[in-house]
């Protein structure tokens, strides 16, 4: 599993301090810590995340998790991107340079990763759809901005279900949609606002 976490602010975007908590939740849930590759941003000037390293890791991993800002380009979907300290990880780069031979699931804990074109919703190319094209048959995304406080709760409940068998047997990617349902139900039952739990969506198997 590859986890890419970007807690720092940049390019006019607010910091995402709870992404560090999100990573802690992943560490606690993954059955074998040696199967987790971490990329944690510290800012553009202090050891920025390498896009080349990310793309290389994505080609080999089974699970990929991104906790960062995301943006959907209004006129050129190929310029839609996950925003990292090392640069913009655009749809174009993902499509051109990433074909995940072992890919099973991509979890995009970032804003607008599944936001579509209001005028052509059936034709929109989103970041979530791009991960499907890149070789991940199951993808979790968001239709609009998500709460930084809710993200670790959703991720924790999601991976609690996916990794519930520990090292006895590998996670079943076909249960990703149900795992997301359980995770969203958890924050919904806590009394959070409607627009905080609705954005989470699943695509694929």
Mark where each language-model region is:
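An often Trp-containing, charged/polar helix-loop segment at the C-terminal end
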Residues: 151-205
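A domain-level signal for caspase-like cysteine endopeptidase catalytic cores
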Residues: 1-72, 108
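Catalytic cores of nucleophile-dependent amide-cleaving enzymes
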Residues: 62-163
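Acidic/polar loop patches that form or flank catalytic/metal-binding clefts of enzymes
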Residues: 34-39, 141, 176-177
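Hydrophobic alpha-helical scaffolding
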Residues: 12-16, 29, 44, 84, ...
């Amino acid at each position: 599993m590859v986890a890419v976490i970007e807690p720092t602010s940049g390019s006019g975007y607010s910091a995402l301090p709870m992404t560090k908590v999100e990573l802690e939740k992943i560490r606690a849930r993954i059955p074998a810590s040696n199967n987790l590759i971490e990329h944690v941003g510290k800012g553009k000037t202090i050891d920025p995340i390498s896009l080349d390293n990310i793309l290389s890791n994505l080609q080999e991993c089974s699970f990929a998790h991104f906790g960062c800002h995301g943006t959907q380009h209004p006129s050129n979907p190929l310029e839609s991107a996950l925003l990292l300290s090392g640069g913009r990880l655009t749809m174009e780069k993902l499509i051109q340079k990433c074909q995940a031979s072992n890919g099973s699931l991509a979890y995009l804990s970032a804003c607008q990763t599944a936001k579509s074109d209001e005028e052509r919703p059936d034709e929109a190319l989103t970041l979530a759809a791009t991960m499907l094209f890149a070789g991940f048959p199951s993808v979790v995304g968001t239709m609009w901005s998500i709460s930084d406080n809710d993200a670790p709760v959703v991720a924790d409940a999601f991976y609690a279900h996916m990794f519930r068998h520990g090292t006895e047997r590998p996670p079943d990617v076909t249960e990703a949609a149900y795992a997301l349902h359980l995770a969203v139900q958890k924050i919904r039952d806590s009394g959070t606002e409607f627009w905080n739990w609705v954005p989470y969506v699943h695509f694929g198997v």
